[in-house]
Amino acid sequence: MRDCCHQKSISSIIVALLSLPMSNFVAHGQQGTPAEPIDVETKMEFALRGQREAHAIKYGDWRKFCFQTPGAKTVCRTTISGKWETGQSAVRVDFIEREGEDAARLQLFLPVGLYLQAAARLTVDQGKPFRIPFVWCLTNTCIAGDRANPALIRQMETGQQLKLEVADTNLLSVSTMLPLSQFASVRKAAASRIFKQEVDE
């Protein structure tokens, strides 16, 4: 019984987070403004000391999950996760959409130990990078998120690879490449799983 209640509690938290309006997720100072492409050379407020690739990360397939709560609009998450060879979670990218709304949100779950002022940067193939600011950190993960720029969405749907760049605390640029070949088809398809949250009377 205790395990059952614990699982319901976790499910409630997940649904509650995904049910918040998109504007509630936007970082302070960026409300209502989607991530814009940046010129890294001119907009960087600090000097990176070098670069390195992230340790080997194995990515799974893109998947789509939807969350339904009575009296609220359905929220769907098209997501991909990557793990290190140890099996520990390394990266998760969520593309979040709410039924009936044009705005979408990109949310990145990343390891701790990063230089948060640098923000995360997403680049599709050889395009310009889009800046995704960090929103908050927990004990074992840091979360970056912002409204998804329509141009970035179009690039993700037609591109082949998504480059994710962050800066570590040594001011080294760290990057990893995520596959995009399945993104568009998974996003437009039916959800592979639907979570229904009942409201207690």
Briefly describe each language-model feature range.
Residues H28-E201:
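A generic "folded-domain core" signal
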Residues M1, M22, P34-P37:
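Intrinsically disordered, low-complexity regulatory regions of eukaryotic regulatory proteins
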Residues C4, S23-G29:
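Short, low-complexity disordered leader/linker segments with a strong preference
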Residues S12-S23:
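Bacterial N-terminal signal peptides
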Residues R2-D3, L18, P129, P133:
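Well-ordered, non-transmembrane segments within structured domains
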Residues M1-I14:
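Bacterial N-terminal signal peptides that target proteins for export
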